[in-house]
Every structure is written in structure tokens, then in C-alpha cells.
């Protein structure tokens, strides 16, 4: 499950995890810039619409909690920014703060 693409398509990752427990063993974790117009194909997403975790539209915390409950076994931090390293560092700090 790619929570960015799910949210971009007007769906809620938590709802899908709850509805299909065990169906998603892998999760790509990525956030969407606030103000991004949602809908359409995830293939149309621009690189600048991906932001560090916890700063965008996706309820990352809720998705991660649901992932633990409903059978996600592996998480992958996905970052598509041209200068991805600073955003990855910020996302890792966010994840570390969720403990």
C-alpha cells in the first residue's frame, strides 16, 4: 500500500487497512504537500507534492498505528524530491518522535 497514492485518490489508508486486514504486508510511507489538489491518477503527481512525513495532508501517525494492527510487516520511506536527503532526515526525525 502506498499511503500517498491512496490519499491522493480520495481514500483513507486506515479505512482500507481495517477493511482488508492482512492484505497489505508492505507500506510505502510518504506525505502530500498541503494545498495539493487531490484526485486523478497518482502518475500525474509532481515531485514537489511529496513532503517530509508529518508536514502534509496524510494522517501518517494513524496509518502507522493501523499498520501495526492490521498486518503490515514492512514499511518503506519513499521520497521523490530532487534533494531528497534533507527530507528523509526530517521524516526520520518525525518517525523517531512517534515512539
Stretch-by-stretch model annotation:
Residues 1, 7-99:
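Histidine-acidic metal/acid-base catalytic patches
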